[in-house]
Swiss-Prot record:
Function of the protein: Mediates the production of the second messenger molecules diacylglycerol (DAG) and inositol 1,4,5-trisphosphate (IP3) which plays an important role in the regulation of intracellular signaling cascades. Regulates basal and ovulatory sheath cell contractions by controlling Ca(2+) oscillations via IP3-mediated activation of IP3 receptor itr-1.
PH domain ranges (all copies): 855-960
Residue spans of biased composition, Polar residues class: 31-40, 1283-1329
GO cellular component, one term: ruffle membrane
Ranges for region Disordered: 1-40, 570-594, 1270-1350
Protein name: 1-phosphatidylinositol 4,5-bisphosphate phosphodiesterase gamma plc-3
Ranges for domain PI-PLC X-box: 352-503
Domain PI-PLC Y-box, residue spans: 982-1092
PROSITE patterns according to UniProt: C2, PH_DOMAIN, PIPLC_X_DOMAIN, PIPLC_Y_DOMAIN, SH2, SH3
Source organism, top-level taxon: Eukaryota
Required cofactor names: Ca(2+)
Annotated source species: Caenorhabditis elegans
Signal peptide: none
One of the GO BP terms on file: phosphatidylinositol metabolic process
Amino acid sequence: MQHGSLGPSSSSRKTTVTSTAGSVHLHHRSSNGFSTASRAQLNRHNEMDFGKMFAAMEKGHKVCKIAVLKKWDPAYKQLTLDRYSRQIFLTKLELSAVRNKPTILDIRQIREVQTLNYKLNTIKVDDKWKKDREIVNFDSKAILIISYGMGFALSYWILLFESEDACKLWSQGLHNLMMDTRDRDSSPHPLRIERFLHKHFLSLMSPANDAVARKHMKPFVQTSLQFKVQSDQLQQVTEDQMNSDQFSFASRQLIHVPELFSSRFADLAEKHERKGLVVTFQNFLRFLDGKQFDELASNRTRALEFLNRYFQEDQAYFGDRNEPSMTVFEFCDFLFSRENSLWDPTNEKVTHDMSRPLSHYWIASSHNTYLTGDQLRSESSLDCYAQALLMGCRCIELDCWDGQKKPGSAEFIDIVIYHGYTMTSKILLRDVLHVIRHYAFVTSEYPVILSIEDNCSVPAQRLLAQELKDILGDYLLTQPANREEKQLPSPAALKKKIIVKHKKLPIESEDLAAVVKTDEFQDTEIISRECVKKGILMVKNNNSHEWTSHVFILFPDRLCYLIQTADPENPNDDTVSVSGDEEREEETPSGFGVKPEEMHVTEEWFHGRCERDEAKKRILEHKEKGNGLFMIRDSNLFIGDFSLSILHDGKVHHVRIRSKIIDKEKKYYFMDNKVCDTLYELVSYYTRHYLTTAHFKMVLTIPCPQPQPHLNQPWFSATADKEKAEELLSLVPEDGAFLIRTSSTDSSVYVLSLKVDGEFWHYRLKRDGRIFVVNQKVFENLNQIVEFYANREFVRGISLRFPVNEKDISHLTAELAEARTPGCYMDLKDLDKEVQARALRPYRGTADDELSFPANVIITVLRKEEGLWRGRYGSLTGWFPSAHVQEILPEKVSTSETSNYNTIELAGTLIERIHDADRPNVIRISQSNQHWMNKQYYLLAASSSEEADGWQNNLFELTRSVNTKMSILRTKEKEKRIAAELSNLVVYCQAVPFDPAHIYNDAFYEMCSFVEGKLDKLVEKGLLPFNSRKLSRVYPNGSRITSNNYSPVPMWNAGCHMVALNYQTGDKPMQLNQGKFLANGRCGYLLKPDYMLTDDFDPTNTEKFATAYPIRLNVQVIGGRHLSRKDKNKGICSPFVEIEIIGMPCDTKVFQTKTIASNGLNPIWNQTFTFEIQCPEVALIRFHVEDGDFVGPKTDPFIGQAVFPVDSIRCGFRSVPLKNQYSEELELSSLLVDVQMCSREGTQLIRSSSHFLQASRLAPVFAHRKITNGDSIPREMAPRLRTSATDRSLDSPTNSESRATLLSGQRGSQDSMDSAAETSSIASGTISSRDGKKKQNWLKKFSFGKSSKS
């Protein structure tokens, strides 16, 4: 396939279609694909003409895609551009290639475009490039490196061009396209919509006619757009063959919900003689003023300029250039645009006062900055430092270790960075420092702190100090900013300076005792201790003979391994391969995995295998529905064909649907005059056109309902709601009790209610027409689901065991009561702490429902029966004899290291290499003095012979040493020494152990670091006043080997400055970190509110903060657009939104909306929630969207998230652009919310949270600006404030409840939709207070809460 068919030529003029009700108008944009503003900006930075540049890129160039330090395909490929979809294509040139479908890269995913010459000679890194013997022989100016990805770790296209000029052209062109595509200001929302639709048009169109066939639309709508579309609706908006404009028009028709505008903004619409309903410029200004509280409304010139940028000059104008208008659909698009974001763009600049001491700021900080994934096997990468710095991180970590020495000399030639004693790869310190120098001040000009985790010998430390000085040069801070200072300098005073954090030699003495003093607040996790070797080995269970993977840590006197298993076959999913070698075919959209030619399978009218007589019976059962009642079934006489059964004048007629092969494709028809590609299209055609036979002439009007074999089943209840279902399930004491019912809010939706671990879980069964999709398996009816999961795990090891309904419940409970021993059942779900037991000896279960486990492991007990307990070990759940375990009393349950690892003492052991039938490379460890007794031994297996040799040699050496000194263990670590050269570079961040006696001393330049679990103890010892004067850094427990993160909120609330997180992990803590540091221009420094700097500050008693300004925040979640999971092919999502305030313990609260079934394209919620926030200056608001349907062990319900500081959001009708787990913006995915903010008493309206809640922290230039805030509710707001959340719903447009009442008294949720029994707990705004039950220690007061189950 030639790329010429993939997109328009460079000279073509792109047109798109938008529509009002019944009207269409065309929009044109510049032929080079740039918006006007971005075109002018880019022309200033590039000497080449963009039109010619992009024309050359669209024509294409020959390249080889190469790989570093691995084999690669030397065949030439064609690299081409489609400027309108913003995609580049890599297509094989061989005409005989079987798979000639191009590899596609979306430019919005590109992070950097650099030539190899730029990396080697400008950034000055050698890294892997100099190690590759093939690459060093090529011209570095002809190699282009494209870094891309939507996570932290990046992938790469490394392309070798035929000439330097071609490489330079693509480097400049892609860089400019990347900046225009990714930059929030130069890619307006209408242009983003055009690109989105054009991309999908290219992926669906046929090269033969440059059109999309109707048969591809339903899979596209159900999979890509995530919308359960009805056949008649699709027929109305689509054509048999659609060009780009028709495809765009059809897609937009499906996206828009007319009621969204009519229920809220009808007063803004005016009739236009040619364009139907429009929003005039004057009404748009009225909207900005009255509903958005936007200062833009008062400046007509700026408002015009804003619309110019948004609509790109000529799109919005219907005549008078000074009186632009927009259609209703365009106005709704604007509501969901990022130009209308909840985020206040004034915070894109540095607005905080940056002249305060460093200890007054939170500082964005990274842990293990060099890692792309977990702490055992992942790759160390220079790009991780670049990415962290570009994200605004200001404190990065360097784990430094001795590198190579000169041959025959003790002098070191390099220092390496990696995670010591593990299989993580190594990178050179000098390369890292070059990258830091290059990227340190691109995003922010404020100081960067290097946290040196020094594991080097003293000679290597001298080299470390020399490389810091040589490479960082003038950026490196080596002298105080002011010799007379009595406190830490400010970020402004340290602009473009790099600060070294390290221990420092004592000034007055060579005695190093103070330096090596043990810090009780450091990480005590075993995996973090200094060791000889660390890695993953398999260990054999001597009873079950099963092999499991564990992390082993070798010390001089013992070998330890973590009880938690480590699966080397399944590395961290968050880690992205850095090879970028992904020559894979693009997935084609298919609804629920069904191909276009099989789309009839999901339709209500398709009945599959059904005999002629049975078909007649089914139709006559519903004959009251009248003529045109029909069904399609498999033909009994002609295998592979189908038959139509239809009701006409009380009689059932059967008509054969014929098929024939045309151009190697199967076609379907009744008559030769109409032939269709698919059965679905054929039936859809005759739902709008007459089918004429010898006996009748009629339209297929009503699908015959599917049979309902579930109605008389013992597990089905037609009347039970959520509460009744839980009441019935509670009568059955066993897990696995279940029933299926209809949803209280939608009778077409079925819900499975199931008892799991003593709790009641409710699953909405995902349905597409006649089929159900459960755990990615397809079922034709409910009976099949129940039969399938009757003896298979549905969730958490539970199958559907005990069917329940109103009719049979008494009989079932009598049977269970008779079979059980009375009084010995114990449900543990309500205990504050889990009951745990230690295995006294191993147990190997013989039945499927029994639990197997080795000795000395911890088992979570779920239930007890006489002689038999049920528990969970790892991911397994089952029954086991209680005599094999000993219960651990609650007060003795310990989280210490003794409970998470086992120890093999090396003293007196025999190390042998043996041959095992199960595994190669096996090492046996046994006691050397036990020859005939039933001795205990360990069998360990390595993944390779070389790895086994390494472990065996280390074990031999250490065992010999330990056996000669049985009574004396080797010292764990030698006295630490610090090179004077390195000590001299440490000025402000002098690392010392935390000492309560020194909190108030004058050593402001000292700082402490401590592990996350020590926060409680440190707060008790005076951490809060310490943090107002000196710096502190928190880092994760060493046991977090997957690089998962801890909650940073307790540490921020305690005033800790550098809360170091693993930036490579896209989890909730990192999302909160990204959201918090959006503020203050994303510079990485946030000024704390004044009340956190006082001596009496106490996060648990915020009521006494006189300087805090308590507020009431109302958030109505109106709707969403383009919501989908990452795996779109696994069904249409049913989204719900979780809204959470995270901050001080008293403020933390979460609400959840109801679930909208099978609609990710344009769901509507209309639910309002109220938050009372005592300390809004430190609070974050988090939106989290999930699929409410997803169940199963390998499913990810995540749809999107967004986090904003409460003091940085705008009021009014605003969009919430959603992001992925790594806080990268998703394409067009957003929520629409209505946000109102006022004083907690409800008397003062807050128009701008940024200026009002940040007032005491703003720089003078911003603080002196005139702000209208804290006013009484203005007169022009009265009409809106008299409208409650219920007023603006789609269901009830008129209601007289006043907004003033809402602001002053509303607690919980005002749900404008049907609040039937099933959703009452959600719709009423059921909350889960974050402080909840009183905790025993300070840290737990800040733990994340969970929303209430619904």
